[in-house]
Amino acid sequence: MMQSAAVPAEGAVKGLPEMLGVPMQQIPQCAGCNQHILDKFILKVLDRHWHSSCLKCADCQMQLADRCFSRAGSVYCKEDFFKRFGTKCTACQQGIPPTQVVRKAQDFVYHLHCFACIICNRQLATGDEFYLMEDGRLVCKEDYETAKQNDDSEAGAKRPRTTITAKQLETLKNAYKNSPKPARHVREQLSSETGLDMRVVQVWFQNRRAKEKRLKKDAGRHRWGQFYKSVKRSRGGSKQEKESSAEDCGVSDSELSFREDQILSELGHTNRIYGNVGDVTGGQLMNGSFSMDGTGQSYQDLRDGSPYGIPQSPSSISSLPSHAPLLNGLDYTVDSNLGIIAHAGQGVSQTLRAMAGGPTSDLSTGSSVGYPDFPTSPASWLDEMDHPPF
C-alpha cells in the first residue's frame, strides 16, 4: 500500500516558445496517457509522473487528488482497495472497508447484514444462539434442530451406500496386502487413484481389518470345536466298547449273584459255598482217584482254582446217584490237562479230572423259562466271582 500526493513540478511551466529551447528528453511523460506533461502541476506516484486528470482509480475511475492506494502497478481509491485486497466477508466474499462495523464468529468475519441464518434469512443479533458450519455458514438454533430431526428420520428410512467398482476394489486389496493399516498420505494417494472419498477409503480399511479379525476368531473356534468333538467321539466310542464288552461278558455282579442263587436253588444246592457238591456221585475210583462220569459225557471246562464243577445241563444231575460227601479242607492245584488235583489233608490223594469238549449247555439256548440266557461257557460268567474255600 502506497500513499502519494500531487506535487508541483520544479519551476513554473513557461510558454511554448520558451519550451522550444528545452530538450524534449527532459520533459516527463504521463504514466497514464504516455504524453509529455506540459501542465503547471505534475503528479508523481510510484516513481512515475501523471497528469492530474490521468491519475484515476482502476476500479471506479474516480480521479485521485488527495490520497490513493496501489497494488501490483495499479492505483485504487481507499474504498476499492479494501474491497479488493482487504478482509472479505465470509458470506458474500466481498471486501470489508476498515471503517465498517463487522461481526466475527471464530476466524470468520461478516458484514452486519450478512450475519444471518441461511435457512430463514433472519439476521442474528448479539446473544442469539446459532450453529457455525464448516464452510462458515450460519444456522439459527431452531432451524438446526428441526433439520437434524428431519435428517435422523430420513437416515432411518434410507441409508446412503457407497458403490465400489471392481477396479477400485482391486486397488484397495493390493494396498491392503502391502499394509493393513496405511498412513494418511497412502490413503490420500489411494483416494486420488480410485476417485473415492478419503473417508470412504479409511472406512474400507477399518471394515477389512475387522473382517480379517473375525475370520481368524471363527477359524480358531472351529478348530477347537473339532478338537472337542473328536475327544467326545473317542470317549463315546470307548464307552460303547466297554458297554459292548460288558454285554459280551455277561451281566453285572448283582444280576450275576441273583441268577446264581436262582440256578443253584433250581439245581438243588442249599448254600453258596457248595457244601453239598459231594452229593453228585457216580464216579469210579481208580488207583486212589475217580473221574466224574454221569451220563457218559465229559464236562466242559473248569475254571483255574475253582473247587467245584458245574454240570452242562440239569438233566445230567438227575441221572447221577448219590454218594458220601467229599472231605473238607482240600488243597487244590491245577493240572496241565485241564483238570483239578485235590489233595486230602491226611495224605489221601484224589484226582478230580474233567475233560473238555462236552456237549453244549442248554442254559444259553433259552429252551427253559427258568434258565436265563448265558454264554456257552460258564467260564465267561463265573470269571469275576469270589469263591470262598470249603
Swiss-Prot record:
SMART domains: HOX (SM00389), LIM (SM00132). The keyword S-adenosyl-L-methionine does not apply. Coiled coil: none annotated. One of its GO terms (biological process) is animal organ morphogenesis. Residues 161-181 are annotated as: Interaction with DNA. May play a critical role in the development of respiratory control mechanisms and in the normal growth and maturation of the lung. Binds preferentially to methylated DNA. This is LIM/homeobox protein Lhx4. It comes from Mus musculus.
